[in-house]
Amino acid sequence: MTGSPLTWLSDQLFTMGVLSDALIWVVMLLFAAAGITEWYGRRSGTDLMQQARVTATTAWVGFGLFWLNSVPFWWFEHQSFVEALLALIGAPACFYAAYELYTGRTTLFVLSRAIAVMGFIYLPFETIPAITVGGVSLPAPRQYLIEVTTVITGWIISAAGYSPALVESPEGFMATYQWTLSDGHIYNVYIVLACTGLGSIAVFSGLIAAVRAPLSRKLRALAVAVPIIFVLNVFRTAFISIAAGNQLMHWFPDAVLFLFGETNPYRVSFLVSDRILSQLGAVVALMAITYLVVRELPELLTVLEDVLYLLTGEDHDLQAALELPREPVAEQPGASQGD
């Protein structure tokens, strides 16, 4: 029936909207509640492990449902095969984490705390809209971040010798670079939240915050991860804008259009530069950043080993495999302090 709750629910399933926003906020609150319960029980000597375990298990199940629900969005709407694949892998991994945590793998509490921190960093930018309080209009938090990223991206584009027009995006932000092609066609490149690097910054911040280590080393790890991620993202965004705005990667158009279910030939350069090259490059970059961060904060190895266990069902010793120290390099006995 038109306008019925069932109709609304069917419209909200397998996309990103009000239902998915509500679900992910509930999941993050459950992760946070589990972390606080486990921490309080440990600090006070009270046996609250069962309550924390049940809460965290529920959160993991909800997290799995969120990723499962998002797969069609990433595949069909966002046209990102990498993100769709990650969501498809993430859903059963979350269900498996719920099972493992409930049956006794308590090291997963660290990853649970990390996810809570990630969510509280990322979700305000993703879900909070512009509001008016007492007659004063407050922009959506995402607007600040997107427009700052747009300005910095523009500096890089200008330094490369290009000068597209900066116009308003569909969201109402000054965050679109408008290119005029040689045949007179107008092509717009939109700067969105994903271009800011916020997602990756939230992931590393959550992981760093969740482990037990001295604050000084956590800050050093953040100082390694956050600037690198942001700088790489603005250069990536500038690269995509230049490539798409000048049709520099109009490669194998028929194959690319078929692969992404597109018909617009002007989209080929964007799809190649963003959905293929940049996303594959991002995977490599994140692996390299992870290696650098772990050298500053070896406690993260436990979390990474848990993630690998969820994906493979086997325990791994990353310290031995990657020849990484369990102590940070600068703090190892006898470490060189310079020539």
Question: Language-model segments: what does each one mean?
Answer:
Residues 1-339:
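Hydrophobic N-terminal alpha-helices or hydrophobic patches in metabolic proteins across all domains
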